[in-house]
A protein has these predicted regions:
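Long, amphipathic alpha-helical surface segments
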Residues: 1-63, 72, 79-81, 87-105, ...
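Repeat-mediated protein-protein interaction surfaces in helical alpha-solenoids
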Residues: 116-120
Length: 184
């Protein structure tokens, strides 16, 4: 894993500069969190950003969750996004990278079978949208870890609701994730 993007993001969050002590501490974090498996490709990032969109002013996602940038709900420091928050394009990209890293680590930890890059990217989009807990407790993951790739693919389509209601945007997103997961 190249650490330059991580440290670039940390510099933005810190206001431009890092002390040597901060660099040393961040190096320890990188060593612990560096994914031991796959990372999201440009195809996966494009899928995520095409459905998330980009908003530089915090907004309610329709079910009471304040969101900013490319769908970020918590900043890298753990603080939740709230009404009135704003960000720059560079900050939005930093938040996206931070969120993706967390979800990549989770996917690499939870999935026990080989994945193609397309399958990983589809899972990255799914997990970015729904969170690690939903992936961890899903029938999708259970089927996948039993090498039932088709059954896992079909499970994407189940996750099309927000606030108990079927959402057209989620139907489209799950169909796109399923198609990518099955793509050779």
């Amino acid at each position: 894993m190249t650490t330059k993007p991580f440290f670039d993001a940390a510099r933005v969050i810190a206001g431009g500069k890092l002390t040597q002590a901060q660099v040393d501490d961040l190096n320890k974090v990188v060593e612990k969190l560096a994914p031991s498996g796959k990372t999201t490709s440009d195809v996966g990032i494009d899928l995520i950003t095409s459905f998330e969109g980009t908003r530089f002013n915090a907004y309610d996602d329709g079910v009471g969750v304040w969101t900013i940038g490319f769908g970020t709900i918590k900043y890298p420091n753990g603080v939740r996004v709230k009404k009135g928050d704003t960000c720059t394009e560079q900050q939005a990209e930093t938040y996206l990278k931070n969120d993706l890293t967390k979800f990549e680590v989770a996917i690499n930890k939870l999935v026990k079978v080989p994945l193609t890059q397309n399958q990983f990217d589809a899972l990255a989009s799914f997990t970015y949208n729904l969170g690690e807990t939903n992936l961890a407790n899903s029938t999708l993951l259970k089927k996948l870890n039993k090498s039932d790739y088709q059954g896992a693919a079909d499970q994407f389509l189940v996750w099309n609701r927000a606030g108990g209601k079927v959402m057209k945007g989620l139907v489209r997103r799950r169909e796109a994730e399923r198609a990518l997961f099955l793509k050779k």
